């Protein structure tokens, strides 16, 4: 890739726009593709993404476009920020154009009917592409406002990791590398569920002890499940694990937190999602994660509890009673209990 060749960003949402701006600020021409031609035209003319990043100026180096074919043909490095429900249908018809290209997923979600992560779908669509993921405690608006931020690029392709670091690393954005693509990506997808729980807890006025307990036990659940699927537990002590979990469960800027907060205020799930106005991946992830945890017999009481509230007609008080009266457990799964007398 030369400096003159555009980097592609697929998706017109908040995170795709924030990454497009970062790339342009670092001197790289960017083509940001979006499905809606009216949105692309509006962003071209007004230099702003008012629906998803209102008040943030779109860098002059970002070219909003609606021609997917030309975008894919003209770029060797492509950042994919499409909703999990749309990624396969958008890219599968153009699989031949992706051969040998660098594809970096920015989407923190799981495909409902396959339980595949986004990078696994990319690998299936384009087996000869170079695949990576970018994940971490990365609120789009804060990135766009140049708050000091760090993230993780994960791939077994060291050259791809270096390439992503080179194009994104800057004065306010630091990029670390990892070889645990599966763990990094799974952490980003799973934490969305717990952000919904955290938002509910805040809306209901629960104390600091409760919020701390929720985040810590969420990390335990995430790690337990991820290790059962082959991830490295140490990944969850890094930016893509506990780092992402903390920011998503603590910030009103988090989309999934906002959904949970609305639920805690008494809105229905449909009303909460409608108020948000964009995709909250945690709602979709919850359904497939609950089923998968049952299938592989991994203990995930917070996931089961939230699912019971949203989809099984259980009340919050019933779920809290069940969780607090459950059989006592050891704190950390990876510490041996053989030392007990």
Curated annotation (Swiss-Prot):
Sn-glycerol 3-phosphate binds at residues 108, 136, 191, 244, 254-256. Keywords: Cytoplasm, Lipid biosynthesis, Lipid metabolism, NAD, NADP, Nucleotide-binding, Oxidoreductase, Phospholipid biosynthesis, Phospholipid metabolism. Catalyzes the reduction of the glycolytic intermediate dihydroxyacetone phosphate (DHAP) to sn-glycerol 3-phosphate (G3P), the key precursor for phospholipid synthesis. Pathway: Membrane lipid metabolism; glycerophospholipid metabolism. The active site is at 191 (proton acceptor). Pfam families: NAD_Gly3P_dh_C, NAD_Gly3P_dh_N. Its EC number is 1.1.1.94. GO terms for biological process: carbohydrate metabolic process; glycerol-3-phosphate biosynthetic process; glycerol-3-phosphate catabolic process; glycerophospholipid biosynthetic process. The lineage of its organism: Bacteria, Pseudomonadati, Pseudomonadota, Gammaproteobacteria, Pseudomonadales. GO terms for molecular function: glycerol-3-phosphate dehydrogenase [NAD(P)+] activity; NAD binding. NADPH binds at residues 14-15, 35, 108, 140, 255, 279, 281. It is found in: Cytoplasm. This is Glycerol-3-phosphate dehydrogenase [NAD(P)+]. Signal peptide: none annotated. It catalyses: sn-glycerol 3-phosphate + NAD(+) = dihydroxyacetone phosphate + NADH + H(+); sn-glycerol 3-phosphate + NADP(+) = dihydroxyacetone phosphate + NADPH + H(+). It comes from the Bacteria. Disulfide bonds: none annotated. Belongs to the NAD-dependent glycerol-3-phosphate dehydrogenase family. GO terms for cellular component: cytosol.
